Amino acid sequence: MAQKGNIGVTTENIFPVIKKFLYSDHEIFLREMVSNAVDATQKMKTLAERGDFKGELGDLTVRVSLDTDKGTLTISDRGIGMTEEEIKKFINQIAFSGVIDFLDKYKDIANAMIGHFGLGFYSSFMVSKKVEIVTRSYKEGSKAIKWSCDGSPEFEITDAEREDRGSDIILYIDDDCKEFLDKLKIQELLNKYCKFMAVPVAFGKKTEWKDGKQVDTDEDNIINSVEPLWTKTPSTLKDEDYKNFYRTLYPMQDEPLFWIHLNVDYPFNLTGILYFPRIKSNIELQRNKIQLYCNQVFVTDQVEGIVPEFLTLLHGVIDSPDIPLNVSRSYLQSDANVKKISNYIMKKEAARLASIFKENRKEYEEKWDDLKIFINYGMLSQEDFYDRAKDFALLKDVDGKYFTFEEYQTLIKDNQTDKDGNLIYLYANDKEAEYSYIEAAKSKGYSVLLLDGQLDTPMVSMLEQKLEKTRFSRVDADIVDRLIVKEDKKESELAKADQDNLSQAFRSQLPKVEKTEFYVDVQALGVQALPVLITQSEYMRRMKEASKFQAGMSFYAQMPDAYNLVLNSDHPLIKNVLENENKECADQLKPVVSELKGLEARLAALHQTQNGKKPEEITQEEKDEVKTTEQSIEEQRTKKNDIIASYAKGNNVIHQLIDLALLQNGMLKGAALDSFLKRSVDMIK
């Protein structure tokens, strides 16, 4: 006899709430339905193991089937089933009180708690216009019953036909959710959410190619592995087992560097396998490759807040019943168990890395270029990881040798300490582009690190703070004798006027490059040093690089690149340029320089007469005279610079020296490079 009634909820709008609010991601209904079927089946197995069920277990496969003609999706199991009383208790009385209070509390959360409130079954109404349950309990004397509901608070219970224990959940798919009647869509969702569930899940039959088409076989299409690798004891597994499982998770990926098998049952439950992927370039860095499971049921691959941020770059699986199935990210981040899990994972990763470093340093060094991004990111983002990693983090020099922080400090402290007691770490970002600077540093007996990684700029800044009296400087930041200052700077013997004229000759012929500024400096570098070289300010270059990583530093990103063209006044070529300049320009410069000196003396006298006067005491005539004199000085300086520029324009040595410096820095390209090559040939002739 049929029974009708109302589902026990505190408000009649519970189903619209479920449909529109609680489940923002509609596709998870299938996960909930299959997960419930698996739970019922596992309970059946447990009853049999305990002796509470004496009958035959038989086939325990959970089956998912489509009937496109009827518009139904059915999830069937041979689990414990339900009696009529259990239907009324577990289905009709939703464990959900204070719906309005709940909405007020969680209205800003994208994915509210589902399983926590016992609402998993009701996710079926997100995609269904009607749901039927045909069930029969394993208990002796139980009869089959059918429960049906069309999404309103009303339900109906009737007698049904079912020979065996278990349940069929029949979903009559809504007209606006027809994609869930598509075989490929259901296969995709089962592969996503159910591929490691603990009971076999079948969806249709396996197919084979026969008579020119794909046909069904008699073999079930089992979509899951009931004993995934992370559930097994690590001591029973071989390296090849871990590699094969990685290939299952990530087809077409290179073999991982190594892996960590997680297994803890106190103070929380956690199992899993995390892999360090092999990364060939920074472009391949991808987050969210870790899959989170709850009792072998897929939850999410958005694991920020569950694992330390830097470990989101890893691949693999984490499974924990202590992480709720359906929660918001903000809930996860504040959950005490999640925080413990995150800290545990960080400690395990650090311990594994330390173990490999200690037991097989050669292998560790071979893998360092791939590991570096993970370890550096960890040290930058998590203080307690830095404290653990500083003993196994490595520095690599330009010759390919590896050192721990402590080893490298010991190596360079005698030769690379400046006059103020600072330890100077020299480095290059590109061995080829900075080759001559590297060689100049090595000729002084200095060691040069190779810092060519994506995170090396922020790492340098962090290490300068962590390591006492330490400074990093790129090899092209200054001339080699000024990179590590061991005595006061040697001044050029050239008179200031000669330095100014020499600087102007080179300045006038420097290329005009967009967003680039050149400055010219004259220094006494010694006869053996290069005649000309280009350096770049360590501070400004680092600020521009840091602007790529840090918000609020766009000011530096917009600034032009600044370079110093350093002229070695001790070099014969530079001396020759100056000597020729003075000879060629002397007659033209003499009257201009004389006039300029007179004007500068006059301006100094005018300023002298105004010293001590208040602004209102200075007459307009005096102000005009100062302004006129300043304009005249500027005109004479322009004349002087034009004379020098005219000389420099026709001087091939100046052009050649500038181009050589640009070429050394990879800054000579296109037409300028072509002109340099032609000029070089002409000069050789």
Residue ranges: model-predicted function:
Residues M113, V131-E154, D174-K178, L184-K685:
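GHKL/Bergerat-fold ATPase module in large chromosome/replication-associated machines
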Residues M1-D175, E179-F180, E188, K195, ...:
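GHKL (Bergerat-fold) ATPase N-terminal catalytic module, capturing the glycine-rich phosphate-binding loop
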